[in-house]
Design a protein with these regions (language model features):
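Short secondary-structure boundary/capping segments
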Residues: 6-7, 24, 66, 122-123, ...
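Extracytoplasmic substrate-binding proteins
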Residues: 51, 62-140, 164-166
């Protein structure tokens, strides 16, 4: 979501980001509210937000409920791990932040070109390619992308078979 906001030219609206927002590098200059799935009410309130925008994996739910009960608007975008899902996410974020329509159309057009190119390359794969997507977290212990992850969606969009698809 952070990357989309920057790509739309709406970064001046950001007051903080979560620790997974590491692109573009300018996002690192903003205060961090912690890990997207382990947010705290106090940490969020310390940034004085008027809107909290994120995907449906942010939480925990109790924190989001507390923030809403304090009158902070919450916009949750469903994460769909596909090319169409990415384009829909851009449209949602653009609408929520009131981005310039030309910026939104340009970003969607550029992404669609990349998705079309990816589709063409994927059609050239003649036998299944097994792959793993590993993330190196701060403690140095790698985490594998299972079936219910955005990493799995990336592998599928690339035409690859996730070797860890049996795990969520």
């Amino acid at each position: 979501v952070t990357e989309i906001i920057y790509a739309l030219g709406a970064e001046s609206q950001l007051v903080a980001v979560d620790t997974t927002s590491n692109f573009p590098s300018a996002a690192a200059d903003l205060p961090s509210v912690g890990y997207v799935r382990a947010l705290s009410t106090e940490g969020m309130l310390s940034t004085d937000p008027t809107l909290i925008l994120g995907e449906d994996d942010m939480g925990p739910p109790e924190v989001l409920s507390q923030l809403q009960s304090l009158g902070i608007e919450l916009s949750v975008i469903p994460e769909v791990w596909s090319g169409k899902g990415i384009l829909t996410k851009v449209e949602c974020v653009s609408s929520i932040v009131g981005a310039d329509r030309r910026a939104s159309d340009a970003l969607i057009g550029s992404l669609q070109e990349h998705l079309d190119e990816l589709s063409a390359r994927r059609s050239q794969i003649d036998k299944p390619i097994r792959a793993a997507l590993l993330l190196a977290l701060r403690d140095g212990v790698p985490t594998a992308a299972g079936s219910a992850t955005s990493g799995n969606g990336v592998l599928e969009m690339a035409g690859l078979t996730n070797v860890f698809a049996d795990f969520e």
